[in-house]
Amino acid sequence: MTVLKMTDLDLQGKRVLIREDLNVPVKDGVVTSDARILAALPTIKLALEKGAAVMVCSHLGRPTEGEFSEENSLKPVAAYLSKALGREVPLVADYLDGVEVKAGDLVLFENVRFNKGEKKNADELAQKYAALCDVFVMDAFGTAHRAEGSTHGVAKFAKVATAGPLLAAELDALGKALKAPAKPMAAIVAGSKVSTKLDVLNSLSTVCDQLIVGGGIANTFLAAAGHPVGKSLYEPDLVETAKAIAAKVSVPLPVDVVVAKAFAEDAEATVKAIADVAADDMILDIGPKTAEQFAELLKTSKTILWNGPVGVFEFDQFGNGTKVLAKAIADSAAFSIAGGGDTLAAIDKYGVGADISYISTGGGAFLEFVEGKVLPAVAILEERAKA
């Protein structure tokens, strides 16, 4: 994957527009989870150190396009950046017709989705973004799967279009895990439905040696193998699909599970052998024996890709499976990459973030890359690098 990299450019005195993913949760005007901002800070600092006039843009939430809304304003993000950088970071609302920014200055542009044509990737808007800068830096991996004005369109028209350090690191890490992984490779794919992760499962079945499934996905594979799943969430119409995937790659199945009679925070958890699952049981986690067996598989792996908790870890009595696997990944010497919102929440809960080789900032973009799909915002950077 050949793209121009911001780190290789002389940015002294240049007007640099950086597209970051600062779409963070905000409550009562305060940022409640800063992970994406923290991930973007090194890029912003580097551009300033290189002597650039720095303009940062992002979306936040899903406002009606072209209309300002207070709840989707980047004002709380500007306040957070000001505090984190120890300098005033002005929020600029009217910037499309040009803005005065000097070398060493930093401004944050208001939500790009307040601009008409952003989501439709309108050329007229993209050209206005491009006219603001000498160098465009795409650094928002989390939105790279969307062809929008500030992710794709601007890169078509900017004088120079480059990948920022965060985006470049994501592409390198994912490439390392998927293009030429050190073997053996294990993947953990968990979630409620096979249907939503079907392309991920199919893609990984061609590169990994062990495909560990969890959640509702595992229930469909258990049913495909003839095991009882009680009243657990599963997809009967995808049983044949599960069989076909299991014929291509080793899919180790749980030997024991944690069940309950209801899906509730105070539900009583019972460990059962898989053969003993009753008609009124719901499978809500893998059992302790299974967790240990899967942990052993992870210990011998050289590459691990993790997407999704294997149980309802939000309720502690159904969190042991995810906790054991999280610790096993952290303890492993393998190159490990993790991605997806629930996965990141599990990493936070069990405090293993420092011991995972790479944590992806992208949810949908992470999955689409794993599926082997082209990410439009990356494809345009590759095109521009060739030109």
Curated annotation (Swiss-Prot):
It catalyses: (2R)-3-phosphoglycerate + ATP = (2R)-3-phospho-glyceroyl phosphate + ADP. InterPro entries: Phosphoglycerate_kinase (IPR001576), Phosphoglycerate_kinase_CS (IPR015911), Phosphoglycerate_kinase_N (IPR015824), Phosphoglycerate_kinase_sf (IPR036043). Pfam families: PGK (PF00162). It comes from the Bacteria. Its EC number is 2.7.2.3. GO terms for molecular function: ADP binding; ATP binding; phosphoglycerate kinase activity. Pathway: Carbohydrate degradation; glycolysis; pyruvate from D-glyceraldehyde 3-phosphate: step 2/5. The keyword ATP-binding applies. GO terms for biological process: gluconeogenesis; glycolytic process. Substrate binds at residues 21-23, 36, 59-62, 113, 146. Signal peptide: none annotated. Disulfide bonds: none annotated. The keyword Ribosomal protein does not apply. Belongs to the phosphoglycerate kinase family. Monomer. This is Phosphoglycerate kinase. It comes from Pseudomonas entomophila (strain L48).
